[in-house]
Structure formats: structure tokens, C-alpha cells
Amino acid sequence: MNAVVGFSPEKAWQAAIANLEMDMSRAAFSTWVKPTHLVDFSDNTFVIGCMNSYGREWLENRLTTTLQRFLMGVMNREVKVRFVVCDQIGRAHV
């Protein structure tokens, strides 16, 4: 994908989700990716909230590299992805 200058972190994350939705099975996407959300973007790191520690581990092991590559392309810079468990109202628990 060509780099698009000016993507906000929120737009970049939404683009990454849309890209994953096309590449993953519907069941896997709905179970693991759809419930995630962008918690924070600082120091070139996307902090992504997950529902539980099992989901965090699943995403870390299977999608970190894919997401980093995609997000680096749309943000046009080096970025990292970190997954955290969030409670029902979206607070991250590290």
C-alpha cells in the first residue's frame, strides 16, 4: 500500500481493521479484531485495547507484524503496536 501522508492514528487504525477484515475469516475477525479499539497513540506506538488477556495474547502472536507493516505504510513512519487488556469502560490494565 502506498503511504498516505496525514492519516490520523484513529484513521490509520480503522484502515488497518478494514484491511484485516478482508484478509481474515469472518469468525476470527469478529472474535479477535472487531472488539479492539485504539486506546492511545504516543511515541509512535499504537496501544490497542483488547477484552481479555487471551485475546491480547492471540493478537500479539498472530497480528503484530502484519499490523505494524500496514500501519507503517499509512503513517509513513516507523511505528509499534502494543496490545493491552481493557475493562468494560475502556480503561487499560497493564
PLM segments and residue spans:
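Intrinsically disordered, low-complexity basic tails and flexible linkers associated
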Residues: 1-91
